[in-house]
Amino acid sequence: MSDPLLDAADFTDDGLIPAIVQDAETDQVLMMAYMTAETLQETLDTGRMVYWSRSRQERWVKGQTSGHTQTVEEARLDCDGDTLLFRVHQEGGACHTGFRSCFHRRAADDGWTTDGEKVFDPDAVYE
């Protein structure tokens, strides 16, 4: 049996759809990644975020290496059907650089500034 969200999602010609990930408790935008129909279905089936890595050309379960998992609280589809929004419970940091959010850089008059502190050491996690 197919899922209504999967049926309504409009994937690109290369089989991908962007997924924006937001903290369900704080509303902070954590990251954006891509999904395939298969990783979307796995996410819906398991309640854990599963993505498609464009650089490695393989699926990846968020937190499988780092332990910084994302548990789905809610899934949404935008008005055009071509972008997903997941509200998640984030364990640890979402960003592979060690920050809670991948959007930790903010434009300032003199360049970029960093918001927040690292919540983990990526060198210790990704050896």
From Swiss-Prot:
It is found in: Cytoplasm. One of its GO terms (molecular function) is phosphoribosyl-AMP cyclohydrolase activity. Zn(2+) binds at C79, C95, C102. Keywords: Amino-acid biosynthesis, Cytoplasm, Histidine biosynthesis, Hydrolase, Magnesium, Metal-binding, Zinc. One of its GO terms (biological process) is L-histidine biosynthetic process. It comes from the Bacteria. Coiled coil: none annotated. Its EC number is 3.5.4.19. Mg(2+) binds at D78, D80, D82. Pathway: Amino-acid biosynthesis; L-histidine biosynthesis; L-histidine from 5-phospho-alpha-D-ribose 1-diphosphate: step 3/9. It catalyses: 1-(5-phospho-beta-D-ribosyl)-5'-AMP + H2O = 1-(5-phospho-beta-D-ribosyl)-5-[(5-phospho-beta-D-ribosylamino)methylideneamino]imidazole-4-carboxamide. Pfam families: PRA-CH (PF01502). One of its GO terms (cellular component) is cytoplasm. It is an enzyme of class 3 (hydrolase). Homodimer. Catalyzes the hydrolysis of the adenine ring of phosphoribosyl-AMP. Belongs to the PRA-CH family. HAMAP family: HisI. This is Phosphoribosyl-AMP cyclohydrolase.
